[in-house]
Amino acid sequence: MRSAEGELDGQVLAERRLIRSLFEYRDAMLKAMIIGLALVLAWWTWASWGDIQIDCGRELYVPMEILRGRLLYRDIWYPYGPLMPYIEAALLATFGPHLLVFYAFGLITTIGCALLLYRIGAMLQQPVVGFTAALGLLLQGFAPNFMNFIFPYSYAASFALFLALLCALLVLRHIVHGGSSALVIAGVAAGLTLLCKPEIGEACYAILAGATLLDALAQRSALVLIRKAVTWLPGLIIAAAIYAWFVLNLSPALVLENWIGPPGPYFFRRQGRYLYGNAGFRFDPIEVGILVAAAMLSVGLWYGIARALRSRSGRMWLAAGVGLQISLARVIPPFTGRLPFGAQLLGLLQSMLFYPKSMFFIGLMAWLAAIYRLVESPRDRLALALAAYHLFAISCALRVFTQIVPFGYAIFYAPPLFLSFLLCLAEVVDHADVAVNANRPNAVNVIMTAEVLMLLFILFPGPSERTAKFTTSWGSIYVTPEEARVGRQITEFILNQKQERQRVVVLPEGPMFYAITETEAPDRWYTFLPGFRSPDQQRDYVSDLRRANPKYVVLTDRSFQEYGTPRFGVDFDQIVYRWILSHYHVINEFGQFEAGGGSGGLAALVYERND
């Protein structure tokens, strides 16, 4: 008898080992697919990321200035937290000044973000949900412009997202599996996120505080609240100490003067509302009402689709619908344009179902549903984890909550929310399966497959117009032929004047040219963005120009439409521009210069000092 029982126990153990190995194999395979897709996207879009004029040059110039002994904020203007420039400086000191260093760092960060999203999705639902979220992030992260993850407008944004996802994963692991060490590391990750992008750091503290408070309420224990808060507070103390060092050694006004974010500085009063509103941080009651209605409609449509999946004909209709959208989006786009409102209808379907613009409010509904579930079952750890994660996702996306789109500024804030949407979608399918007795895992797999196909065909980067290689001392970047030609002209001009020991200033924005020619701006303002300098600060800059006495000024036709004031010298910083016109004269033109960016690319006028 014992022999039979032992044989049965051995068989059960063998089956468990087999099941575990199958799960581990699936997990390893999905991770390998994520890494493989990232490498394919990197190969397909190689070196076509970033911009040689807008923002990206700051990521090269600022760490080089730090290595020259300059102090952030005091000697170099920088609009975000202090951590990323010093990491970049350490990378340059270790590996040397080369774009490959930044490309590699960006690629590693991107893969890290995707794997973290995958792990969170697999923990809260099932691996296919996490895989779909990871794929969405990857397809957004390799865009051939400066809104990408490989060579972005700011590595502070992409690295902050990585740290925030790490924090979220550790908090969720603590909720589900227990252990205080995960919470300690999560607190440190949250503090580091605050030192990169404070608004993303706030989302970290939303999940930390939310999870702590909800757990304490569920257990009805003030001791739990105090003990867990003390566990993750060291990270906040580290961040506060570093910020305090800058504030005490400089001044609060000087530090705030650098930042784009907080209310108070001159920039916020002049440009903040337009810039933030344009990015999606706006409160229009009518727009919010439309988005709430769209969120409910989107969830309702997916519920109907999930119910239809109980039959083979329903699955065939879903496949046909996805195939039609793919055809209209990629295979026969000219046909779409000839249809009455064809492109608009296609965009509406995509933004209602596969990447809803109303995703913030879907996430909000998912959070409220998780709170309700937690109230009904206070000891349900999965409900607590879902409530904590949805709070994190909507907090992270608050900066762009009315403009949730799979491109542009939103890609640094919306990936956690996209996973929140997928989790909600899986819950909707679950509820529909219960209602119609369908096979839930199969239904989730079918819908996630449809989501993956649509993401691939909508977001996979097409052929780029960036066909010309712009080669510098830092390596190469692909840009448009005109940008490459003008970029070479500007670079060669600065290098020639450097040999003659003549100083060249690039305005209003072009820090990459300072970096690749190993020259410096005349003072801490290496970039002129609308609204950052008050009239008094403009006069101070003019005084610095007089002291530096540059022989030449290269004035590009950079347009600042995103700020609502596109033209340097006309819409902003008129004092500086008038001084240049009165002390310099035009001697050359690179490209076809049109004030305010009319050239559509890169063009510049060369001014020489009136001696």
Where are the regions that the model predicts?
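Extracytoplasmic catalytic/substrate-binding loops of multi-pass membrane glycan-assembly enzymes
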Residues: 47-62, 73-90, 97-100, 250, ...
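Short periplasmic/luminal acceptor-recognition loop of GT-C membrane glycosyltransferases, typified by
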Residues: 79, 463-532, 541-546, 550-562, ...
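Aromatic- and kink-enriched transmembrane "portal" helix at the membrane-lumen/periplasm boundary
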Residues: 99, 113, 135-161, 170, ...
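Transmembrane-helix signature of polytopic, membrane-embedded enzymes
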Residues: 117-145, 161-162, 177-185
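Membrane-interface transmembrane helices that cradle and orient dolichyl/undecaprenyl
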Residues: 159, 164-185, 216-222, 297-307, ...
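Short hydrophobic alpha-helices at membrane interfaces in multi-pass membrane enzymes
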Residues: 170-192, 221-234, 313-322, 380-392
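Membrane-interface alpha helices of multi-pass inner-membrane proteins
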Residues: 182-198, 204-212, 243, 323-327, ...
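Hydrophobic/aromatic-rich transmembrane helices and adjacent perimembrane loops
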Residues: 202, 341-366, 402-439
